[in-house]
Swiss-Prot record:
The keyword Magnesium does not apply. The gene is deoD. PANTHER family: PURINE NUCLEOSIDE PHOSPHORYLASE DEOD-TYPE (PTHR43691:SF2), URIDINE PHOSPHORYLASE (PTHR43691). This is Purine nucleoside phosphorylase DeoD-type. Pfam families: PNP_UDP_1. Gene3D superfamilies: Nucleoside phosphorylase domain. The active site is at residue 205.
Length: 240
């Protein structure tokens, strides 16, 4: 059952989908981590794949940049393809001095300057939080694999090139761990349609120091984040 943005047949997606922003990262995850991965959609070059990880059927699909883009894909996956869990695996920027480039952040919540969730929630503030069980499973996966991961709030920004640089001071004061562009939207879509969601991000650049990773590194590595996401699915299955 194709949608305007996904041309996969019914049953093409697993009940759990990992979602990076970059479709080429989706391709990398499928080719590197999944067995017997098959491409199931390619509309607008937003690639999606389904395969298995340690025998568990899992899908991966890009969601693009920003809340409007990721909201479209998340909504269609949930309502048209029966997806129950979405794990965003993406990059973020750091503002706190104690957060370093390549750190992994498990986003238990996501603040935002976007008005999209207010439109959804009748002009009220929606508390965009991750699913607790998925968050707990990710923390357990990180510990089991010996991967250091921080847990806390992300900030989902509408503008990549923001003119309000003073807002970074406010974010630091409030303990924001990473700045990205999608988590708050994905959390709200999941809540609206009865699914579950979690965002796991790797710090790709530091807004204060200027340190950054290359675009190639962002596309082809960040394996710790992906490992946590995949292992958390297996842990979650055992807990259910």
């Amino acid at each position: 059952m194709a949608t305007p943005h996904i041309n996969a047949p019914e049953g093409a997606f697993a009940d759990v989908v990992l979602m990076p922003g970059d479709p080429l990262r989706a391709k990398y995850i499928a080719e590197t981590f999944l067995e017997d991965a098959v491409q199931v959609t390619d509309v607008r070059n937003m690639f999606g794949y389904t395969g298995t990880y340690k025998g568990r059927r899992i899908s991966v699909m890009g969601h693009g940049m920003g809340i409007p883009s990721c909201s479209i894909y998340a909504k269609e996956l949930i309502t048209e393809y029966g997806v129950k869990k979405i794990i965003r695996v993406g990059s973020c920027g750091a503002v706190r001095q104690d957060v370093k480039v390549r750190d992994v952040i498990i986003g238990s919540g996501a603040c935002t300057d976007s008005k999209v969730n207010r439109i959804r929630f009748r002009d009220n503030d929606f508390a965009a939080i991750s699913d607790f069980d998925m968050t707990l499973a990710a923390v357990q996966a990180a510990k089991q694999k010996g991967i250091a991961a921080r847990v806390g709030n992300l900030f989902s920004a509408d503008l990549f090139y923001t003119p309000d640089v003073e807002m970074f001071d406010v974010m630091e004061k409030y303990g924001i761990l990473g700045v990205e562009m999608e988590a708050a939207g994905i959390y709200a879509v999941a809540a609206e349609y009865g699914a579950k969601a979690l965002a796991i991000c790797t710090v790709s650049d530091h807004i204060r120091t200027g340190e950054q990773t290359s675009s190639e590194e962002r596309q082809l590595t960040f394996n710790d984040m992906i490992t946590i996401a995949l292992e958390s699915v297996l842990i979650g299955d055992k807990a259910e």
